[in-house]
Design a protein with these regions (language model features):
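Charge-rich, intrinsically disordered N-terminal extensions
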Residues: 1-149
Length: 149
């Protein structure tokens, strides 16, 4: 089998030192997670074997996205998680940076609907791309990975 469906990851407790948790060749605290040990398919583009978090400048948002990515790595294929974080989420992060929102807890229904309109009217994204972006955002909010301020 070329890829694990989900990874067996260490459970994070409130007192866990996050810098001690390894994800592939990376530490949880790194801004790039190297997933090459888990993605062995020769046909996978090299750049698709990494989850990149550098595009998220807000520390609380970045931590929430990392928690979500870590959780999802235990549930689905690493490539899918990489797509969620590096293909579908950047538009959301851009929109909320522009609008001064720094926590998933602060996202209102009106904000969410305006994000949808912004993707359609300003970014001119395809319906499928917009749906995928909204799915990831909605899931992060629903699951409830929020950092206290």
């Amino acid at each position: 089998m070329a890829t694990n469906l989900a990874l067996q990851l260490q459970v994070i407790e409130p007192d866990t030192d996050l810098s001690s948790i390894m994800i592939g060749n990376s530490r949880y605290s790194d801004d790039v997670w190297d997933l090459r040990p888990f993605i062995t398919a020769k046909t996978t583009n090299e750049s698709h074997k990494y989850i990149r978090f550098e595009y998220i400048s807000d520390a609380d948002m970045k931590e929430t996205v990392k928690q979500y990515a870590y959780y999802k790595l235990g549930k689905m294929k690493p490539q899918t998680v990489r797509n969620y974080i590096n293909s579908y989420l950047p538009m959301f992060i851009e929109y909320y940076s522009i609008n001064g929102i720094h926590s998933f807890e602060d996202v209102t229904l009106e904000d969410y609907l305006n994000f949808n309109l912004w993707m359609k009217d300003e970014k001119k994204v395809a319906t499928g791309t917009g749906n995928n972006s909204c799915h990831v955002v909605e899931e992060i909010i629903r699951i409830g990975f929020h950092q206290p301020r």
